[in-house]
Amino acid sequence: MXXXXKSXXQXKIXXXXXIDXXXXSKMTSWWNLGSLLGICLRLQILTGLXLAMHYTSDTATAFNSVTHICRDVNYGWVLRYMHANGASMFFICLYLHVGRGLYYGSYMFSETWNIGIILLFAVMATAFMGYVLPWGQMSFWGATVITNLLSAIPYIGTNLVEWIWGGFSVDKATLTRFFAFHFLLPFIISAMVMVHLLFLHETGSNNPTGIPSNIDMIPFHPYYTIKDILGLLLIIMMLMMLVLFSPDMLGDPDNYMPANPLNTPPHIKPEWYFLFAYAILRSIPNKLGGVVALVLSILILAIIPLLHTSKQRSMIFRPLSQCLFWLLVADLLTLTWIGGQPVEHPYIMIGQLASIMYFSIIIILMPLTSLMENHLLKW
């Protein structure tokens, strides 16, 4: 086996990337998330492929084709709910992965970090387009509201929206192109993941201390392959519990009603993994301002390496920065909660405060705290 893995040219690339890759000996379970994301992506592509064989991207039949998958296709309901809840697992892993990068200073690998941000945008776009495909009420109105935000762009906005819609409203053309892009994007994401890993393997992995560990390295296989299997078992257990016990827990009941352009649902909201960004969007009364804030809520990750003022890379020995990090996590959870609430008196104010907090923690408080910690440590 050893000889075969080393000799064939293609096998050699795979062996170098996944088996013999030297990894730091101190990496905790927070470093499992990368492989879990890879598994989530594979699972989504496989279940999505099987679903696409039975789905029709036509406004007249889309809703019925999804019903047909759940009722008539062998284990179609398992495929459908694994795909829908697999997206939730994907985003849980994604947000934890980004959080790990923030906490341990992995953003100092700027190429890997920037490709990661592009990947995050690509996955979010894919998930949004996938949500439109069942053509339920929330699919239709979610697509209408979110694509309509582009009309806030000065001068070209209206033309741009009509170009994306393929008409004067979300209709057959929109659904067909969303299906085409939803099918295509995961393969583009897979290619970008390879580039992400390529840049990561140029520098080697970070570790919890944030100190270079070139002196103490171990092979990826068998140590981290075995360690990753634990995370895999946990995520599969979570996913299967969701799929088999409460498959609709994270979905919206409105999506069980066929799309009706004449009847607007009382509360239009996206899936739970977009609620924090949706809350930031809604907290600004101006349309263009809201769109800018929405994009910046993710794009702000790109300037985090520039805001790193600490002499230490990781937060593991910086208690004040740790407090701010967990405050940021609590703030994001608050935003997620607010995004799912109606636009009423207490929620509007809480959402605005949480949005201000989100940006001020990242842009102002974290860099200042890092400088203060440097001073306290006499550096």
From Swiss-Prot:
Binding of heme b b562, residues: 83, 182
* Cofactor(s) recorded in Swiss-Prot or TrEMBL: heme b
Residues reported in the UniProt entry to bind heme b b566:
97, 196
Spell out the molecular function terms from Gene Ontology. metal ion binding; ubiquinol-cytochrome-c reductase activity
Q: Where in the cell is it found?
A: Mitochondrion inner membrane
Pfam hit, one: Cytochrom_B_C
Q: Name one GO biological process term.
A: mitochondrial electron transport, ubiquinol to cytochrome c
* Tagged with keyword Transmembrane: yes
Positions bound to a ubiquinone: 201
Which PROSITE patterns does the UniProt entry name for this protein? CYTB_CTER, CYTB_NTER
The cross-references to InterPro entries, in alphabetical order and at most eight, read: Cyt_b/b6_C (IPR005798), Cyt_b/b6_C_sf (IPR036150), Cyt_b/b6_N (IPR005797), Cytb/b6-like_sf (IPR027387), Cytochrome_b (IPR030689), Cytochrome_b_C_euk/bac (IPR048260), Cytochrome_b_N_euk/bac (IPR048259), Di-haem_cyt_TM (IPR016174)
Task: Provide the membrane topology annotation.
Answer: Multi-pass membrane protein
| Swiss-Prot/TrEMBL keywords | Electron transport, Heme, Iron, Membrane, Metal-binding, Mitochondrion, Mitochondrion inner membrane, Respiratory chain, Transmembrane, Transmembrane helix, Transport, Ubiquinone
Q: What does this protein do?
A: Component of the ubiquinol-cytochrome c reductase complex (complex III or cytochrome b-c1 complex) that is part of the mitochondrial respiratory chain. The b-c1 complex mediates electron transfer from ubiquinol to cytochrome c. Contributes to the generation of a proton gradient across the mitochondrial membrane that is then used for ATP synthesis.
State the similarity comment: Belongs to the cytochrome b family.
Q: How does it assemble?
A: The cytochrome bc1 complex contains 11 subunits: 3 respiratory subunits (MT-CYB, CYC1 and UQCRFS1), 2 core proteins (UQCRC1 and UQCRC2) and 6 low-molecular weight proteins (UQCRH/QCR6, UQCRB/QCR7, UQCRQ/QCR8, UQCR10/QCR9, UQCR11/QCR10 and a cleavage product of UQCRFS1). This cytochrome bc1 complex then forms a dimer.
Misc. remarks from the entry: Heme 1 (or BL or b562) is low-potential and absorbs at about 562 nm, and heme 2 (or BH or b566) is high-potential and absorbs at about 566 nm.
The protein's name: Cytochrome b
Question: What species is this protein from?
Answer: Myotis bocagii
Gene field: MT-CYB
